[in-house]
């Protein structure tokens, strides 16, 4: 399904990011990547608290297309999950393996994410979906303050993605522009990744 869209939009390389919190999903998308020339990277999932997580990371990273992992933080009930000491060994291992950490978070996670990013200064961290600010309600001030603090750290990148998916189909350009402008002011082009959020995007847009 993606192939024709890639060609039509003159996109030459893509990264697949996991959509389910299972290692089986990571194996599945790594297999797709092996067979698909334009897929240049995969961001998968592991259970960072599993006693065998390091061996799992070792196995998955035998495929050089594995670039990092994304825990589904926005679905984890414990808002302080990322600060747990039980994660330290596995996160230090990500650094050792040269892998990244995608932070799928909401605005209420950002203060903890700042503490987390300072705790692991050598871990490359990507904030997904600009941290999902509540754009329809115009909630920008606290989000902007927290994102500004994060942008001051060298190990933080921001993924420009998922914006219209979060708003829904009844959105206007005027709603989005203030957030877009702030992100580009904070991170500039060098630390911004564009993500299509495809196929989830097709729920609201082409």
Regions found by a protein language model. Give the residues of each.
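An N-terminally biased module of ancient metal coordination in phosphate/nucleic-acid-related enzymes
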Residues: 1-28
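Short, electropositive alpha-helical surface patch
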Residues: 24-40, 123-127, 176-185
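Glycine-centered tight turns that cap/initiate beta-strands
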Residues: 38, 65, 122, 152-155, ...
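Active-site gating/metal-coordination segments in enzymes
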Residues: 22-109, 115, 157-163, 170
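Alpha-helical scaffolding within the catalytic cores
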Residues: 1-2, 25, 52-55, 110-113, ...
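Active-site metal-binding loops of divalent metal-dependent hydrolases
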Residues: 19, 46, 130, 196-198
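H/E-rich (His + Asp/Glu) clusters that bind or coordinate divalent metals
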Residues: 134-136, 140-206
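A generic "structured core" feature
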Residues: 7, 49, 65, 85-86, ...
């Amino acid at each position: 399904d993606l192939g024709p869209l890639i060609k039509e939009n003159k996109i030459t390389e893509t990264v697949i990011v996991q959509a389910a919190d299972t290692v089986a999903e990571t194996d599945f998308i790594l297999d797709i990547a092996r067979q698909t020339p334009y897929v240049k990277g995969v961001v998968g999932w592991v259970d960072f608290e599993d006693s065998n997580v390091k061996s799992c990371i070792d196995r998955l990273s035998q495929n050089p297309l594995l670039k990092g992992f994304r825990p589904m933080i926005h679905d984890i009930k414990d808002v302080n999950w990322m600060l747990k000491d039980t994660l330290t060994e596995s996160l230090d291992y990500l650094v050792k393996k040269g892998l990244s950490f995608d932070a799928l978070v909401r605005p209420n996670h950002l203060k903890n994410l700042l503490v987390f990013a300072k705790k692991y200064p050598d871990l490359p961290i990507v904030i997904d979906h600009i941290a999902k600010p509540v754009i329809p309600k115009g909630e920008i001030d606290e989000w902007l303050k927290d994102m500004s603090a994060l942008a001051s750290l060298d190990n933080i990148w921001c993924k420009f993605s998922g914006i219209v998916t979060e708003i829904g189909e009844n959105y206007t350009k005027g709603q989005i522009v203030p957030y877009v402008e702030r992100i580009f002011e904070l991170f500039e082009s060098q630390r911004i990744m564009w993500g299509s959020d495809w196929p989830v995007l097709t729920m609201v847009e082409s």
